[in-house]
Amino acid sequence: MKNIDEKIKKIVALIDGAATEGEARAASLALQRLLVANNLKLEDINLDDSPAEVGEEACDLGRRIPEWKKTLALVVAANYRCRAYTSYSNNGRTVVFVGEGEDSVVASCCFRASANAAENCFRTYCARMKALGYGNVSRQKGVKGTWMLGFISSLKRAYAEQVSNDESMALAIVVPESVNRHMDGIGLRTTKIKVRTTSDPYVKADGYESGYGFGRGDRVTAASA
């Protein structure tokens, strides 16, 4: 059990300190696989035997939260036994992950890694389009939102494929009732996420391709070794 604990801790460290987008995504997928293979939850690696408590982990997003980041937060949270909500104050905007034990911390790490990867890939896309003579596409209405939705959609597909390959994982990532009760107690106001988009299908397709390549990182096995 000690060796498994150490592996899990190493993977969590990889997620938060990954040098590249591929390493971060591969590590997060490796974490899911290792937990399921050993019939474990993240709280099982705690040093004490006390019941896992529901905690919150906030990510500071500055003065504004792009709508696509709200969508990304929900996708990541659902796949790490968490719920997520956005918080607004005079000091800035945050997305908050709610989960048992270390779940919220891991979800937060994966969210930051995925958001950074998406931003980097979008900049690469914009540079490529400019080199092809299409100008500064990042300033064109709806382009970034559409591209990001494609990226997020493919990440969601990567999660779904991993679950479909191992039926036990479907149970492993179910959000605990304690987390749902915590969210109910907060009494949040429900708002609809509105991402500004464009009708150009090629923009979303490019985002999807980039996100899928990121989501299916080829270093999963190495990260879990």
Regions of interest found by a model, annotated:
Residues 1-54:
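Long alpha-helical, hydrophobic tracts
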Residues 2, 40-225:
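Extended, helix-rich structural scaffolds rather than catalytic motifs
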